[in-house]
C-alpha cells in the first residue's frame, strides 16, 4: 500500500513539474525578451549584448522605484528617428515590456509609437501619439481625433504607421534579439500573442 501511494505521489510530482515547466516556457518572442531580461537585469543584462544598445547608467539599482524598472536606449538609429527605447516593469501588478520610438515629421512635430507587451495577458498593444516640441519641453497628444488630424495634415497613412513599426520593431529590435538569443520565434512569427493595433481601422 505504501509503495502504491509512493508511486502515485511520484507520478503526481512528475506531472506537476512538467505542467509547471510548460506554463513557464515563453509562448512568444516578447515573452522570451521579458523572461530573459527578468532573469539577468540585476546582474548582467542580456540586452547588453545588442550592439549599440545602452543600458541606463543607474543599473543595476537597489532603489525602490528603479529596482524593478530597467530600461535602455539605442545609440544608433535609422535616419529620421529620434529615440528608440526598451523598458520593463517587473512589478507583479504590471509585468510589462515596452518598445517606444519617435519619428520626426517636422522640426517640432514627432510621431511617438508605443508597443506594450503584457506578460500576464500575452497581449501586444500598439499605439501612436503626436509629440509637439516647444523650447525644451515636449507635450503629447493622445486624443485619437486629434492624432488622426495631425497625421492627415502631414499625409501620413496607416500604411506608413505599419511601415514605421516594421522598420523599428521587426527589422531592428526583434532581429537584434534573434542575433543574441537562440529564439524559437522570429520577426515574422511572433508566436502565441494577441496583437491589438490602435490604428487598425482608421
Feature roles, as predicted:
Residues 70-202:
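Extracytoplasmic electrostatic interaction patches
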Residues 4-22:
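Hydrophobic membrane-insertion alpha-helices, especially the h-region
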Residues 4, 9, 43, 135, ...:
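A sequence-composition feature that detects small, non-aromatic residues
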Residues 18-110:
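N-terminal export/targeting and maturation segments
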